[in-house]
Amino acid sequence: MAADKPADQGAEKHEGTGQSSGITDQEKELSTNAFQAFTSGNYDACLQHLACLQDINKDDYKIILNTAVAEFFKSNQTTTDNLRQTLNQLKNQVHSAVEEMDGLDDVENSMLYYNQAVILYHLRQYTEAISVGEKLYQFIEPFEEKFAQAVCFLLVDLYILTYQAEKALHLLAVLEKMISQGNNNKNGKNETGNNNNKDGSNHKAESGALIEAAKSKIHQYIVRAYIQMKSLKACKREIKSVMNTAGNSAPSLFLKSNFEYLRGNYRKAVKLLNSSNIAEHPGFMKTGECLRCMFWNNLGCIHFAMSKHNLGIFYFKKALQENDNVCAQLSAGSTDPGKKFSGRPMCTLLTNKRYELLYNCGIQLLHIGRPLAAFECLIEAVQVYHANPRLWLRLAECCIAANKGTSEQETKGLPSKKGIVQSIVGQGYHRKIVLASQSIQNTVYNDGQSSAIPVASMEFAAICLRNALLLLPEEQQDPKQENGAKNSNQLGGNTESSESSETCSSKSHDGDKFIPAPPSSPLRKQELENLKCSILACSAYVALALGDNLMALNHADKLLQQPKLSGSLKFLGHLYAAEALISLDRISDAITHLNPENVTDVSLGISSNEQDQGSDKGENEAMESSGKRAPQCYPSSVNSARTVMLFNLGSAYCLRSEYDKARKCLHQAASMIHPKEVPPEAILLAVYLELQNGNTQLALQIIKRNQLLPAVKTHSEVRKKPVFQPVHPIQPIQMPAFTTVQRK
């Protein structure tokens, strides 16, 4: 929607400069004729008039500017490089920089600055364009009405593209006031002067249509701003105005679909998208927007939120295909390799959304469980969005998932006999059980190549996590993030992690600072701390996998020191710290971390009151989209988390040869969960304890049954002589050949 403005902007530039510098009557006449020829599309005649003006006044740089604009429009806006070069030369000629604008004397150069801002906008240099636009806005009073509106619309577009919705809303209020005042002034003039003039009435009708179009555009911008702020109540009111002014046009239906997506009405959002008539859209060559690409992308976002990840990736691939087809058509028009911005309309410089779509695909593939494919998408996206710490975290998550190496049963937490018995060697009396090694740490992930090479290895994950930490601001406080859900932008939605969908829903009207994280939403204060917690947790895990125990302990300690920490990450922080301490032979410190009382909550997020969007239900979508991953990554309850702590605590006691305490921890944990949920590591721990106690036959029985035996007793329990003694009668079932147990 933003890129349909270049033609209007160019015409305004020409009008404002063409009539402002006339001195003689001849120059005024030539200037008027040039402007009329320009507005009617007769660029050859316009250039002839400008050439005559140039002969009369060779020192006026504004004539050169108008000539450059006219030639640009004559080429159907395909000579962006030439226009850009001319503007730079003119800026050097007048020795003026936008930073030096400090008074009304410099206002006459405003057209030059505005043209530069338009080009910067189309080259995606938004920060520089905003700098120029804001300087122009300071001196907007003397500008003629049409040019002032063009400056404001450009700034609004830039604010929305850079997620500064509050600034955009303020400027839109100014625009509304400006348009209504201008309309009242025109009505007054028409009543006094042109009541009987047929041309005057036609002009009035045309200006009325332009005003209605401007109002419709303002309403659409307001909806986009409210969508960014997740202010669903305000958005609901404004959507009605959009539908009244724009009808069932594709942009209005896309906006309403995005609104329903945020409310969680996914089926309605899909229905609205399907009802849009894409065929009526002018096409990307005129607007710079590939509506088909946006359509498939937004469908992918919606299906991601519905946890239909395979359908989501299907739609994202369709969007990528559409985008590639459009880019192929655009590149066919470029003939001069030295002028990469020429050979196609300037508005199409914003058409390519490949990297945003790759980002979406990567997040979706990560949820499907295809980390290597996700890595390939995200590693390409990070070359463009290298300043996004959240993207570096996602890359690290791809590396971790690709190197996890767990079977489906282990992922579900079920004991597998493969995880206990590796093989049986020998025959007869000499047969032996070879227990599987549970040590997956310190694996050599690197096969000799540099860890800086982008491969889905744990070494590269460590680099990604370092980058992510370095990109976070030093002084920031307050968490809120985690999984990778997505956020669709009304006409070209980018998917992203659920932290942005969820936490941006908090009203941040207090102007809290945020850092950009393109192509997704910016990271605000709450999200930044939560992102930091996730990065520290992943860093500790990766350091343990690489055998860097001191670094792992450092990351785990930093994680536990965070002021707002989710229960799940606090649980992981204690586990990682304990594992690092055990590897450093600091068992006593590790036991402190393994206290089950440390676990009081295993929720993925932090309880907060930030969901203040009233009765609208839009925020549910972030949790719905991430719900399927949670059970795989975290214990499902506090009870199961405490059993994990007890199993690990038992292992720590074994290392200190406190076998009675270890046995007590083991069976306390086993009593808290279903026998089938006991992990293979706990069964091996029970085998080890029985061997240390001299109960070889009981150890063999545990291995054969592949579960902890309920009647395992300590010496103090044996004296009680209970009626229930199932272990001894079962012993004859054992194969007598299993006499020796050894660890490979």
Swiss-Prot record:
Residues 74-107 form a coiled coil. Component of the CCR4-NOT complex; distinct complexes seem to exist that differ in the participation of probably mutually exclusive catalytic subunits. CNOT10 and CNOT11 form a subcomplex docked to the CNOT1 scaffold. This is CCR4-NOT transcription complex subunit 10. The modification N-acetylalanine is found at residue 2. Residues 484-495, 602-612 have a biased composition (Polar residues). It comes from the Eukaryota. SMART domains: TPR. Residues 183-199, 496-506 have a biased composition (Low complexity). It is found in: Cytoplasm; Nucleus. Residues 1-16 have a biased composition (Basic and acidic residues). Residues 1-25, 183-204, 477-521, 602-634 are annotated as: Disordered. One of its GO terms (biological process) is negative regulation of translation. Belongs to the CNOT10 family. The keyword Nucleus applies. GO terms for cellular component: CCR4-NOT complex; cytoplasm; nucleus. Signal peptide: none annotated. The keyword Acetylation applies. Keywords: Acetylation, Coiled coil, Cytoplasm, Nucleus, RNA-mediated gene silencing, Transcription, Transcription regulation, Translation regulation. Component of the CCR4-NOT complex which is one of the major cellular mRNA deadenylases and is linked to various cellular processes including bulk mRNA degradation, miRNA-mediated repression, translational repression during translational initiation and general transcription regulation. Additional complex functions may be a consequence of its influence on mRNA expression. Is not required for association of CNOT7 to the CCR4-NOT complex.
